[in-house]
């Protein structure tokens, strides 16, 4: 198997197959569940809005795909600094049956010089997750832009108990970049290598996925990236990975997240 095909296979195993669109419906989420069971194996998870968790759980169970985890989003997409609302949303997501919660860090507050609210929000949301539910924190690196802010946000999230740090919501012009990934995974290497990393949005094909996986191997070791420590947040990426593996047609036209 070529390096490109190896990257494609690994990226599928590490994927949070995502739909977070305003026009999402039960039917679209059912279709997403079926896409997550690929000819190359199951994706790690699907990522959907909280209201669709029950239909997704029912569908995955009917498919015999209980191992595909269900992730959802809270404080999304704007990363507001109201801790109480973020906690209520996170509790509701867990009550719906989420296995993982992707919460948006209050990145604008950090840009304005407030480090405390982000730390406290992540800490409170981690407590709201309880046992067994992973908390992934989206720092919106493409808006932070400044390497010092990306580093600070990553440090605050890890110190507050995040299970993963994630680049992006996919709702802003700049999403996952190799530059941001290097800063974020460097912080993981310094602070706690049990914390995971999730590049989201903008990873378009096997070559790009391979670049992120190669960076992870260089910074954290060849064996580090597993579904417990590395995810790709993506929607259109899957089509291109299956094409690389000669298991489907390439994506046509402009593609989303």
UniProtKB/Swiss-Prot annotation:
- Top-level EC class: lyase
The pathway it acts in is: Carbohydrate degradation; 2-deoxy-D-ribose 1-phosphate degradation; D-glyceraldehyde 3-phosphate and acetaldehyde from 2-deoxy-alpha-D-ribose 1-phosphate: step 2/2
Q: Does the keyword Lyase apply?
A: yes
- In which compartments does the protein localize? Cytoplasm
The UniProt record lists the EC number as 4.1.2.4
Keywords of this entry: Cytoplasm, Lyase, Schiff base
Q: Which GO terms describe its biological process?
A: 2-deoxyribose 1-phosphate catabolic process; carbohydrate catabolic process; deoxyribonucleotide catabolic process
Coiled-coil annotation: which residues? none
What Gene Ontology molecular-function terms does this entry list? deoxyribose-phosphate aldolase activity
What InterPro entries is this protein classified in?
Aldolase_TIM (IPR013785), DeoC (IPR011343), DeoC/FbaB/LacD_aldolase (IPR002915), DeoC_typeII (IPR023649)
Name the residues that span the membrane: none
Give the catalysed reaction(s), semicolon-separated: 2-deoxy-D-ribose 5-phosphate = D-glyceraldehyde 3-phosphate + acetaldehyde
Give the Pfam families listed for this entry: DeoC
* Family to which this protein belongs: Belongs to the DeoC/FbaB aldolase family. DeoC type 2 subfamily.
The task this protein performs is described as: Catalyzes a reversible aldol reaction between acetaldehyde and D-glyceraldehyde 3-phosphate to generate 2-deoxy-D-ribose 5-phosphate.
Name it: Deoxyribose-phosphate aldolase
Q: Which organism is it from?
A: Shewanella sediminis (strain HAW-EB3)
């Amino acid at each position: 198997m070529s390096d490109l095909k190896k990257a494609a296979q690994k990226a599928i195993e590490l994927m949070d197959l995502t739909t977070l669109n305003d026009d999402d419906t039960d039917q679209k989420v059912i279709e997403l569940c079926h896409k997550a069971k690929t000819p190359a194996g199951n994706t790690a998870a699907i990522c959907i809005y909280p209201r669709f968790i029950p239909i997704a759980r029912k569908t995955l169970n009917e498919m015999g795909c209980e191992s595909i985890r269900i992730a959802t989003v809270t404080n999304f997409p704007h990363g507001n600094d109201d801790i109480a609302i973020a906690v209520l949303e996170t509790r509701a997501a867990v009550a719906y049956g989420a296995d993982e919660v992707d919460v948006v860090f209050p990145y604008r507050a950090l840009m304005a010089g407030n480090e405390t609210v982000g730390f406290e929000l992540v800490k409170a949301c981690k407590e709201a997750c309880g046992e067994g539910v992973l908390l992934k924190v989206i720092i919106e690196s493409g808006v932070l832009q400044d390497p010092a802010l990306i580093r600070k946000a990553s440090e605050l999230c890890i110190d507050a108990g995040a299970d993963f740090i994630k680049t992006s919501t996919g709702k802003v012009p700049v999403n996952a970049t190799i530059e941001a990934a290097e800063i974020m995974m460097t912080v993981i290497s310094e602070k706690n290598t049990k914390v995971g990393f999730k590049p989201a949005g903008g990873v378009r094909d096997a070559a790009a996925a391979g670049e992120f996986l190669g960076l992870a191997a260089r910074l954290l070791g060849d064996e580090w990236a597993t579904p417990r420590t590395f995810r790709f947040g993506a929607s259109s990426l899957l089509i291109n990975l299956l094409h690389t593996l000669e298991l489907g047609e390439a994506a046509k036209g402009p593609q989303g997240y």
